[in-house]
Amino acid sequence: MTSPRVNLLDFDADQMAAYVAGLNEKPFRAKQLMQWIHQRGVSDINDMSDLAKSFRATLLDKVEVLSLPVIKDEHATDGTRKWLLDVGAGNAVESVFIPEDDRGTLCISSQAGCAVNCRFCSTGRQGFSRNLTSGEIIGQLWFAEHLLRNDPEAIRRIEKYPTPGWEHTGRVISNVVMMGMGEPLLNYDNVVSALRLMLDDRAYGLSRRRVTVSTSGVVPMIDRLAQDCPVALAVSLHAPNDALRDQLVPLNQKYPLRELLDACERYLPFAPRDFLTFEYCMLDGVNDSDIQAKELVRLLRNIKCKINLIPFNPFPESGLKRSSAQRVNAFAGILLDAGMVATVRKTRGDDIAAACGQLAGDVVDRTRVRERDIHSAEIEIAEVESDVQPNEQPIEWLKKLT
C-alpha cells in the first residue's frame, strides 16, 4: 500500500530541516525548498530547477505542495476579495484580501467554525467543526500571495500604491491578521507553527508588527504566545463590564475581564509595539451609550492600547443593529477626550459578506446550539437612567438570543 504523500506546507523551518535530514540530504536543501515553495510559490517539484535531479526524484515519490481547493472567488466593489476554501467533509473556511493605499492585508481563518459563539459574529452560528492544520493555515497565505502576484488588477493597484516589501520582494501581502473564522488561541500549536513561517526570512519574512493574532480572551494561551511567538495582539473586547461581556462573548464567563486585562499587561513587554489593540463592535442600544464609553475609559485607562471601534456588520440571524455613524462618532469622542487612542474601522467587503463578523462559510449549516427564534424576537432595551451604575445596565434582552 502506498504511503500518503507529505504536504510540505505543513512544515515550518525546523520541521523542513528535520525532514530533509531524514532523507540524508544536506541542510541547505531545506532552505532551497522553503524558498521555492513560500517565496516563489512553486508547487511542482520538477520546476525547482536548482535541486539535484536525484533529490527531485526522491521528493516526487514522497511529497506534495497542496493548498486548499477554491470553492468560490468573490470580488467586492471596493477591491476586497474573498475566497471560500474547501477543507473537506463538507467544511469550508474563508480568507479575505483587503487592499489599501499603504498595505495589502490578508485576513485568514484558523478553525472550521468557532466554538466561542460571540453573539454578533455569524461564524459562531454554524458551530465548531475542527481545527485547521498548520498547512491549511499557511496555505491560505501561500495561495493568496502567489495568485495575487499574477493578477493584473492586483498588480495595477500595487504599482500605483506600493505595499511594504513590494519593491524588494515582489510581495503583494504585507500584513496578515488572524481575524477570520475561529479562535486562533484554541488552535494554539498549529497557529504558532504557521506564524513562525510567516515571520521566517526563508519563507514570507513578515515583520512581527505586521502579523496580528486576534483573540476573544483565552488567557493561558495569551501568556504562552508572549513566550513562544509574540506578534501583535488584538483582543475582542466589545463590552466595558463582565455582565454585558458574559452575554456578548461567552468565553468571558471562564476568563473574566480582570483576568483578561492582567494577561494583556503581562503581554505588553513582549509585544512588537508598545501598545495592544482592543476591538469593540458597535451595537445599537447595546454597548454604545455615553455611560458605556466612560466605563470603557475607566477599564482601559491604565493599559497602553488603541481602541478600534468596529461598525457592526448585520446578518439576519443576529437580531442586532449597527450603531449609527453619529453614535459611533460620539462614543469615539468621549474616548478621545479622555486621552485614549481610538479609531473607527472602515468597513470593507460588505457586498460579498467579507466584512468583520460576517465570515460564516457558504456550506451546510452544522450549528450545534439550540434553535433560536431570532427573526421574531423583539429586542427591548430598557432606558438607562442617569443614576444607574454602568455595571447594572439591563441585559435581559440578550437572553432572548440564547
Swiss-Prot record:
Biological role: Specifically methylates position 2 of adenine 2503 in 23S rRNA and position 2 of adenine 37 in tRNAs. m2A2503 modification seems to play a crucial role in the proofreading step occurring at the peptidyl transferase center and thus would serve to optimize ribosomal fidelity.
Matches recorded under CDD domains: Radical_SAM
Cofactor(s), by name: [4Fe-4S] cluster
Catalysed reactions, semicolon-separated: adenosine(2503) in 23S rRNA + 2 reduced [2Fe-2S]-[ferredoxin] + 2 S-adenosyl-L-methionine = 2-methyladenosine(2503) in 23S rRNA + 5'-deoxyadenosine + L-methionine + 2 oxidized [2Fe-2S]-[ferredoxin] + S-adenosyl-L-homocysteine; adenosine(37) in tRNA + 2 reduced [2Fe-2S]-[ferredoxin] + 2 S-adenosyl-L-methionine = 2-methyladenosine(37) in tRNA + 5'-deoxyadenosine + L-methionine + 2 oxidized [2Fe-2S]-[ferredoxin] + S-adenosyl-L-homocysteine
Protein name: Dual-specificity RNA methyltransferase RlmN
Alphabetical UniProt keywords: 4Fe-4S, Cytoplasm, Disulfide bond, Iron, Iron-sulfur, Metal-binding, Methyltransferase, rRNA processing, S-adenosyl-L-methionine, Transferase, tRNA processing
Residues at which S-adenosyl-L-methionine binds: G182, E183, S214, S236, L237, H238, N313
Disulfide bonds: C107-C356
Family matches, as Gene3D superfamilies: 1.10.150.530, Aldolase class I (3.20.20.70)
Domain (Radical SAM core) ranges: 100-351
PROSITE patterns the UniProt entry points to: RADICAL_SAM
Note: Reaction proceeds by a ping-pong mechanism involving intermediate methylation of a conserved cysteine residue.
Binding site for [4Fe-4S] cluster: C114, C118, C121
Cofactor binding note: Binds 1 [4Fe-4S] cluster. The cluster is coordinated with 3 cysteines and an exchangeable S-adenosyl-L-methionine.
Gene: rlmN
UniProt record similarity statement: Belongs to the radical SAM superfamily. RlmN family.
NCBIfam families: rRNA_mod_RlmN (TIGR00048)
Species per Swiss-Prot/TrEMBL record: Polynucleobacter asymbioticus (strain DSM 18221 / CIP 109841 / QLW-P1DMWA-1)
Active site: residue positions: E94, C356
The UniProt record lists the keyword tRNA-binding: no
HAMAP family: RNA_methyltr_RlmN (MF_01849)
